[in-house]
């Protein structure tokens, strides 16, 4: 399942070169099948184009052999994510397309603590969105801690990471007809030496046939 390995996280060591996953990397263009979102009834995810120009790339190494998360970004913060067991992404088989919904700066420690408390809940309610149930810990209605990750972000294929971002996050889901799902990724993100933001992203699972580079 999408994000199935995200139950822990560690900082990825500096890499000499970023991975190329299904021909996707910095500087490449990704083509999308718009039917992936248009065929779903009642979906919140919308996109007014069917191409993504990748200008940045992130990598997350999961703890305990959980694999790797590869993230490909556009200038307007669309994110295509792939999950793999191998660091080069050659065996990636879980793909999700995310678009930003909202992003706000934390106004203080109390604000960040309140947001982290929301990340622990089995249900996510957000203004302007239908309710989502927790995807991780599915069926468990107890309070659960957010997943913690370190993401190394690159702007150049052969360059060093430009920043490392600590994230506390939780993934939520709701069902759509016919036989589809929509995801909500809620995260508290803080770059080293930077300010904390609270971000909401709406996601759509993709099959390998629904995109190409």
Model regions and ranges:
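Mixed-charge, low-complexity intrinsically disordered regions
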Residues: 1-51, 57-213
């Amino acid at each position: 399942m999408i994000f199935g390995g995200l139950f822990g996280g560690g900082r990825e060591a500096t890499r000499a070169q970023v991975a190329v996953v299904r021909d996707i990397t910095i500087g490449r263009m990704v083509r999308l099948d718009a039917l992936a979102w248009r065929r779903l009834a009642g979906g919140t995810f919308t996109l007014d184009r069917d191409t993504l120009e990748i200008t940045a790339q992130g990598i997350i190494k999961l703890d305990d052999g959980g694999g790797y998360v590869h993230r490909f970004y556009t200038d307007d913060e669309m994110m295509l994510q792939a999950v793999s067991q191998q660091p080069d992404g050659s065996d990636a088989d879980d793909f999700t397309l995310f678009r930003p919904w909202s992003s706000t700066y934390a106004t203080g420690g109390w604000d960040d603590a309140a947001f982290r408390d929301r990340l622990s809940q089995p249900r996510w309610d957000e203004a302007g969105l239908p309710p989502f149930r927790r995807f991780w810990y599915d069926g468990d209605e107890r309070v659960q801690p957010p997943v913690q990750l370190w993401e190394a972000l690159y702007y150049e294929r052969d360059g060093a990471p430009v920043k490392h971002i600590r994230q506390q996050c939780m993934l939520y889901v709701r069902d759509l007809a016919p036989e589809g799902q929509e995801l909500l990724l809620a995260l508290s993100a803080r770059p080293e030496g930077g300010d904390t933001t609270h971000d909401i992203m709406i996601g759509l699972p993709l099959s390998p046939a629904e995109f190409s580079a």
